[in-house]
Amino acid sequence: MKDTDIKRLLYTNLLCVFSIFLSIFIPSFFVDNFSVLEAHLTWLCICSASVTTVNLLSYLVVKPNVSSKRSSLSHKVTRALKCCVCFLMSCFLLHIIFVLYGAPLIELVLETFLFAVVLSTFTTVPCLCLLGPNLKAWLRVFSRNGVTSIWENSLQITTISSFTGAWLGAFPIPLDWERPWQVWPISCTLGATFGYVAGLVISPLWIYWNRKQLTYKNN
């Protein structure tokens, strides 16, 4: 493991963090009195688009998981379509899970679905960029001692931190503080966002700190 690889990971992750800050501040130049809380649905769409774009561009430029086999154009198109289908499936699956855990079934459907979209953006999109629509690779990465690179280590950390942040964000909702951010699903989306950002920042630092203990198996 080289320090240059960890630096590449750090810079890539910081770009993703920067994309979230852009989604917060850029709309205020075009929309009067723009606020993440007051225009929350709009911000969720902007944030998802921004993070997805940066993830795609980063992985296309950095290419952390380059295959030695040269694939045809039709194979690349098929792979891209499969990734889109997987992303949509993850959005609907998360939406169903949220409803099963107590989210409104009929009311606030759009809010719940956009929460599923943004959480899928933080978790599924990086997995698809790095691993593709390969179920075996996903199971390997998220199993014990299954990672083969620092990029997969970072993927583990950011995915877990995003879900943890979303879960912790649900705790303030039933409290009688009467704050605007307690409305479903604002606290959960903010929790997921903070968790994602924390994972992006912590993962390169954790990998650097434990670089001597970390060993990776070849694919």
UniProtKB/Swiss-Prot annotation:
Membrane topology per record: Multi-pass membrane protein
Bilayer-spanning residue ranges: 11-31, 42-62, 86-106, 113-133, 155-175, 189-209
Highest taxon listed in the record's lineage: Eukaryota
GO terms assigned for molecular function: mannose-ethanolamine phosphotransferase activity
Native organism: Mus musculus
Gene Ontology biological process terms in this record: GPI anchor biosynthetic process
Subcellular location: Endoplasmic reticulum membrane
Name of the protein: GPI ethanolamine phosphate transferase, stabilizing subunit
Assembly behavior: Part of the ethanolamine phosphate transferase 3 complex composed by PIGO and PIGF. Part of the ethanolamine phosphate transferase 2 complex with PIGG. PIGF is required to stabilize PIGG and PIGO.
Pathway as given in its UniProt record: Glycolipid biosynthesis; glycosylphosphatidylinositol-anchor biosynthesis
GO cellular component: endoplasmic reticulum membrane
Family named by the database record: Belongs to the PIGF family.
Function: Stabilizing subunit of the ethanolamine phosphate transferase 3 and ethanolamine phosphate transferase 2 complexes that sequentially transfer an ethanolamine phosphate (EtNP) from a phosphatidylethanolamine (PE) to the 6-OH position of the third alpha-1,2-linked mannose and the second alpha-1,6-linked mannose of the alpha-D-Man-(1->2)-alpha-D-Man-(1->6)-2-PEtn-alpha-D-Man-(1->4)-alpha-D-GlcN-(1->6)-(1-radyl,2-acyl-sn-glycero-3-phospho)-2-acyl-inositol (also termed H6) intermediate to generate a 6-PEtn-alpha-D-Man-(1->2)-6-PEtn-alpha-D-Man-(1->6)-2-PEtn-alpha-D-Man-(1->4)-alpha-D-GlcN-(1->6)-(1-radyl,2-acyl-sn-glycero-3-phospho)-2-acyl-inositol (also termed H8).
Keywords: Endoplasmic reticulum, GPI-anchor biosynthesis, Membrane, Transmembrane, Transmembrane helix
